[in-house]
């Protein structure tokens, strides 16, 4: 028999499964220097497009549409099934046409954090809010560090408390530097015991020059 622990709802859960930008709205985008690249709407969390190469510039724009294909089962599915990687690459091509710029060969480093909360944490609004605060502070540190193209996190499911959060980076080195901030390091230590289990998955997206094809592969 599966014991169901109802996940506590918090304000930070709002709108997580709604994309920042829908694929159909690409024609409405304008040339801008900063974009929202995470669930956080405050401007200090926005991504500075001026720091990016052409390939990563197009990728970051495409990732504004990034949400799971299945908002219920995403945390239980393999990454490439949970998210539509082909659609992201297709949008890279669309942005290339829109801005009349060639797509160079480039790659991105992706991290997925899969976790299952302890039942007493899962049902506690205070505990979930604390985790959300650590996430937000860690994102700001990583954004200042540079190279973080996208951050998205979901909501622990009611049955298992299982969840998935993911980051897209320009490189593995950017991810290493971005995860070295004080809030991130100390936050992990403070809440390590709040998880029944967790694991890290690593992936790479390699886009071929011109964007005609791509390779998405696991690194771990």
UniProtKB/Swiss-Prot annotation:
Transmembrane segments: none
Localization in the cell: Cytoplasm; Nucleus
Keywords: Cytoplasm, Nucleus
GO CC, any one term: nucleus
Predominant cellular place of this UniProt entry's protein: cytoplasm
UniProt record similarity statement: Belongs to the UPF0643 family.
Name the UniProt record assigns to this protein: UPF0643 protein PB2B2.08
Organism name: Schizosaccharomyces pombe (strain 972 / ATCC 24843)
């Amino acid at each position: 028999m599966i014991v169901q622990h109802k996940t506590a709802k918090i304000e930070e859960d709002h709108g997580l499964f709604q994309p920042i930008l829908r694929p159909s709205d690409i024609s409405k985008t304008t040339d801008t220097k900063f974009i929202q690249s995470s669930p956080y709407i405050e401007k200090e969390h926005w991504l500075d497009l001026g720091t990016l190469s052409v390939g990563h510039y197009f990728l970051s724009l495409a990732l504004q549409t990034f949400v799971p294909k299945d908002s219920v089962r995403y945390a239980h599915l393999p990454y490439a099934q949970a998210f539509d990687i082909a659609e992201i690459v297709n949008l890279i091509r669309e942005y290339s046409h829109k801005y009349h710029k060639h797509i160079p060969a480039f790659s991105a480093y992706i991290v997925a954090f899969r976790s299952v909360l302890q039942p007493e944490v899962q049902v506690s609004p205070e505990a979930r809010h604390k985790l959300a605060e650590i996430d937000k502070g860690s994102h700001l540190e990583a954004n200042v560090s540079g190279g973080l193209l996208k951050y998205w996190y979901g909501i622990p499911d009611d049955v298992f408390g299982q969840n998935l959060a993911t980051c897209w980076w320009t490189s593995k080195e950017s991810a290493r530097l971005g995860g070295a901030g004080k809030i991130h390091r100390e936050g992990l230590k403070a809440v390590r015991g709040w998880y029944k289990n967790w694991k890290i998955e690593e992936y790479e997206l390699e886009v071929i020059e011109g964007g005609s094809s791509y390779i998405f592969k696991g690194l771990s």
